[in-house]
């Protein structure tokens, strides 16, 4: 399957979870049908984790700005609309089915003082997009002033979020549902 230039391939062995992991950067996404952890770090950006709850096929995107931009010939996954379409299309190519998709939304921190709250707009976009497509949202961790590191295990549907605070790291467990 052709994965395209925005498909994250930066894989490594994650010692925290003792499994293979893929790190995604802004403007990238990853989708998988294997037991792979997907990881990213977010400030004002948003990551949406989507999985087929029956098959365990799932993935994560990482977009920087809400809505659409670019030309029709060159849409960019740095923008929410294209990031969501790329991820959902790839999940379906792997065998995921729209009626069984569910989502978790993370990020949208207000990490830079005095700047327009792009994080809030990013989160609003994600939640509106998912509602319009009737994809249920099972967990949300957005806002606040801290960056986050997000770990997503599509096979189980579990997500782990670590808020990155100056001088300490507080861990949160998000999304107990499988």
From Swiss-Prot:
SUPFAM superfamilies the UniProt entry points to: CNF1/YfiH-like putative cysteine hydrolases
GO biological process: chemotaxis
Classification via InterPro entries: CheD-like_sf (IPR038592), Chemorcpt_Glu_NH3ase_CheD (IPR005659), Cytotoxic_necrot_fac-like_cat (IPR011324)
Enzyme class: hydrolase
Keywords: Chemotaxis, Hydrolase
UniProt keyword annotation of Cell inner membrane present: no
Gene3D superfamilies assigned to the protein according to its UniProt record, in alphabetical order: 3.30.1330.200
Coiled coil start-end: none
Entry EC no(s): 3.5.1.44
GO molecular function terms attached to this record: protein-glutamine glutaminase activity
Cell wall biogenesis/degradation recorded as keyword: no
Domain of life: Bacteria
Catalytic activity annotation: L-glutaminyl-[protein] + H2O = L-glutamyl-[protein] + NH4(+)
PANTHER family: CHEMORECEPTOR GLUTAMINE DEAMIDASE CHED-RELATED (PTHR35147:SF2)
Family under the similarity heading: Belongs to the CheD family.
Described function: Probably deamidates glutamine residues to glutamate on methyl-accepting chemotaxis receptors (MCPs), playing an important role in chemotaxis.
NCBIfam families: PRK13487.1
Identification of the protein by name: Probable chemoreceptor glutamine deamidase CheD 1
Organism from which the protein derives: Geobacter metallireducens (strain ATCC 53774 / DSM 7210 / GS-15)
Upper taxonomic lineage: Bacteria, Pseudomonadati, Thermodesulfobacteriota, Desulfuromonadia, Geobacterales
Gene: cheD1
């Amino acid at each position: 399957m052709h994965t395209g230039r925005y498909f994250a391939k930066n894989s490594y062995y994650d010692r925290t979870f003792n499994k293979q992991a893929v790190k995604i950067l802004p403007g990238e996404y990853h989708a998988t049908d294997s037991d792979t952890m997907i990881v990213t770090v977010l400030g004002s950006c948003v990551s949406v984790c989507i999985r087929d709850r029956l098959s365990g096929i799932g993935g994560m995107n990482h977009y920087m700005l809400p809505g659409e931009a670019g030309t029709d010939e060159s849409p960019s996954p740095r923008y929410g609309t294209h990031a969501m379409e790329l991820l959902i299309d790839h999940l379906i190519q792997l065998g995921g089915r729209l009626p069984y998709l569910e989502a978790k939304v993370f990020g949208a921190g207000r990490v830079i003082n005095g700047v327009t709250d792009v994080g809030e707009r990013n989160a609003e976009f994600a939640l509106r997009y998912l509602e319009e497509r009737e994809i249920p949202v099972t967990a949300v961790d957005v806002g606040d002033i801290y960056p986050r590191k997000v770990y997503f295990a599509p096979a189980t549907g579990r997500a782990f979020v670590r808020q990155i605070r100056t001088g300490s790291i507080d861990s949160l467990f998000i999304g107990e549902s499988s």
